[in-house]
Amino acid sequence: MRRDYVDPGYSPKDTDLICEFHIEPAAGISFEEASTHMAGESSIDSWTEISTLSPELAARLKPHVFYLDADTQTVRVAYSEDLFELGSVPQVLSAVAGNIFSMKIVDNLRLQDITFPKSMLREFEGPNFGLPGVRDIVGVKDRPLVGTIVKPKVGLTSEMHAEVAYNAFAGGCDLVKDDENLTDQKFNGFEKRAELTLKIAEKAEAETGERKMYLCNITAPTCEEMIRRLHVLKDLGASYAMIDIVPTGWTALQTLREAAADEGLALHAHRCMHSAFTRNPRHGVSMLLVAKLCRLIGLDQLHIGTVVGKMHGDKDEVLSIRDECVLDTVPADPEQHVLAQDWGGLKPMFPVASGGLAPTMIPDLYSIFGKEVIMQFGGGIHAHPMGTAAGAAACRQALEASLEGISLQDYAKDHKELEAALGKWLEK
């Protein structure tokens, strides 16, 4: 590599894509050297001087390392939009999250955030429904939505799965979804499960007078099969499909977004596998950026963490991810490594809090997230002493209490399902 891309006097253009990285150089490598090599490898340069890289080409496409802070090991790089294929998340990641993670000159490297210029944002449609559209589908305008995951994760027959879903719907759940590792196994085939569970959702709607949504997992071994399963759901009358975003991949997600828009189905995004590369604060890619890419592509709702449940993620991090999902304009937050982003009118995603939640946590969830959240419970519903329907009822009762500013203990005096939930889960 023959060039120095460190350029602290550079002012990014409105058309530049900007990345923030955390960089820890290898022994014997300066912070500036690691930064310039990373910038070159993620754009136009190679490990040695190449005659095919003309001065004219370099001047037009070279990256600019315009911010360096060795104390916090933070670097920001501005890239010309001409380096990227418009409308392609995979190509962007191949550049700024590709070979650079294999370089020997860094011990650790983390891509914290990307600011996309308006010229690139225009090539993406964002969520088809998003938060406001999901509220229209479900018919709930003024409270958090309540959902559950059918448990156990796997092992139930299609008939048993539908029965569990029915009990959850009847007890008060707005949404019932498959777990991430349930797709099309021999004990619970995709098409039979979808047909039976969508039928019982209709039954629960008729009985309760509320809309009931089943989120069936269409994660599949090929894009063709994934889209076929989407069509099956549409033919069965579904309003939703669920997808495991990381195992499925970015190209498949962009393909799915187009097909789902054609069919008029909302997309629920499960983030399983993300922690393989997001959890280490010194290496990998941030969950905030994963959320940003999901909104860019156009998923309608996304798991973001809970703060109070079993999943990793402190309050500041989770709320930064929430803001990236819902705000029209995200302000920069250097402490959380968040870059400013004007979303250019793309719809907000509905944040989903899920993982290790019980009805007793609803006051805290409501205090943290407010009304614009989907509260999703697994064991916190199905492990209720009185069964799944009672677990769902306890969640709705705890939510009603929180909305009315009443303590759970007081509300439980006239609500036996909540009383039983307090007896099981409330910390003594």
From Swiss-Prot:
The reaction(s) this protein catalyses: 2 (2R)-3-phosphoglycerate + 2 H(+) = D-ribulose 1,5-bisphosphate + CO2 + H2O; D-ribulose 1,5-bisphosphate + O2 = 2-phosphoglycolate + (2R)-3-phosphoglycerate + 2 H(+)
Gene Ontology biological process terms in this record: AMP catabolic process; carbon fixation
Keyword hit for Lyase: yes
Activity control note: Reversibly inhibited by O(2).
Positions that bind substrate: 153, 271, 303, 354-356, 376-379
Further remark: Because the Archaea possessing a type III RuBisCO are all anaerobic, it is most likely that only the carboxylase activity of RuBisCO, and not the competitive oxygenase activity (by which RuBP reacts with O(2) to form one molecule of 3-phosphoglycerate and one molecule of 2-phosphoglycolate), is biologically relevant in these strains.
Protein name in the entry: Ribulose bisphosphate carboxylase
Originating organism: Methanosarcina acetivorans (strain ATCC 35395 / DSM 2834 / JCM 12185 / C2A)
Gene that this sequence comes from: rbcL
